[in-house]
Amino acid sequence: MRADPSAHQAGKVARAVVGVLVAVAFAVAGCTSPAANPAKPAHQAAHDRSRPNFVFVLTDDLAWNLVSHMPHLLAMQRAGTTMSRYYVVDSLCCPSRSAIFTGQYPHDDGVFTNAGNDGGYFAFNRHGDQQKSFALALHEAGYRTAMMGKYLNQYQPAYPEPPGWDEWDVAGNAYGEFNYNLNQDGRQQHYGKDPRDYLTDVLAAKASAFIDSSAASGRPFMLEVATFAPHAPYTPAPRYANAAQQLAYPKTPAYDRLPANPPPWLARHPYLSAVDQANITTTFRKRVEDDLSVDDMIGELENELRAKGLDRNTYFVFSSDNGFHMGEYTLSSGKQTAFETDIRVPLIVSGPGVPAGRVVSQLTSSIDLAPTFETLAGLPVPASVDGHSLAGLWHGQDPVGWRLAILIEHHGPDYSPDDPDRQTSKPGDPPTYEAVRTPTALYVRYAGGAQEYYDTATDPYELDNLAGKGVPEVLRQALNALETCRGGASCWAAAQLG
């Protein structure tokens, strides 16, 4: 069984990249890199008109410690490739989802939070990000496109459908999985309390129907199914109620421990009480139960693809918008930090030319998905996109001069009263920060001047903050360059630690 690949083993491969000359790296980084022009898999060679399909399942708050409880996803992992060092641009729903759609960092697409002037659906619109979405690019290139489930924070079913989607089945605050409205191609439909109304199951049925109609149309398709699970309040499908009540929470060495020399916001946190720890166990069990219906959906969609003869020409991509801590660093249940628990999430892919059972350890980011979809669809990637296509990595290539740093940007805490990501951790959540992650280090710089620096090669659980002893200048320079980069060439050069 494989779930979360070992960070230590991944680090050995990633560190080997550091010795590559920066000049070679920059030459490869242009839009003509191997990743940008993958060789066509052999079984497609006889079908020059055939373009690949995409099924993209995006979960909400799913952390690596849930993957081992999802048998269909584990089977997909064995049949496909796992990106073991895939990071989100921010451990928060809307900034992460915006980056996935646009391929841009928050400082470039303008979405830093879930609401307010610098976040949410309205900021996404105000910054013209709907026009940057990979969905619009694929739609204009002849793809059938469908968006199902959760779109962006603040979006409600009464709002108009954004451009670029042929089918639109999107809810608003449907975190409870029952009693919600769906905007179904511009018409609102209410779903109630019946077991058949369970949202993840409704999405699974609609997604299967979309695959069926796409097969009949003969057109390539992009299907995104964005579940609300396993976000709180953790409502499992009735068939899975109490299915995980014997599980214990998988504690790591960081559980209920403060790092040495913690930043001020974290140093104020009390250690976990007995009640806190009991709640963490209960929450973990509910999250597992919540995800079992997501896993069922994965199996159903794979079966539908096989039944229609589309499985060999469809990339099936699974991921999460952010990770989730539960007791680590004395924090109860939540996200938003730059710790590994929150920013590193699953990215698992199967499909044409994707090697089975492979683990890719290069640093990858949520800004890379949009250019990957566009590249695999045969489209040019706009120069304004900050990310880089993963097509070469997905096809088993090992590109020379891959990036050596990625950026994480977080604004907060600044909650709207109805923000579903409002956390209960006391006395507070992390303030605004920017961070850089490399194969062997994490450097965090807070707006108030505090810093964190962890040598993750020797301290993988990030328990010894070395910032007081000095931060390597190469990390400071990388963060300075990444936080101001704009566009593919600029952001790729900034990521070379040179």
What are the functions of these language-model segments?
Residues 26-47:
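C-terminal region of N-terminal signal peptides and the immediate post-cleavage residues
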Residues 32-34, 49-52, 59, 272-282, ...:
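Long, internal low-complexity/basic segments
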Residues 46-49, 65, 91, 172-198, ...:
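Active-site-proximal cap/lid insertion segments
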Residues 50-55, 79-84, 95, 108, ...:
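Loop/turn elements at helix/coil->beta-strand transitions in domains of secreted/extracellular proteins
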Residues 54-55, 60, 138, 150, ...:
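A short aromatic-rich beta-strand->coil structural motif
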Residues 56-57, 63-146, 167, 173-174, ...:
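Active-site segment of extracytoplasmic enzymes that catalyze sulfate/phosphate-ester chemistry
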Residues 63, 69-70, 82-105, 112-113, ...:
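Short, solvent-exposed turn/loop segments enriched in Gly/Ser/Thr/Pro and often Arg
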Residues 164-167, 171-175, 322-328, 367-370, ...:
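C-terminal cap/loop subdomain of S1 sulfatases and analogous C-terminal strand-loop tails that border
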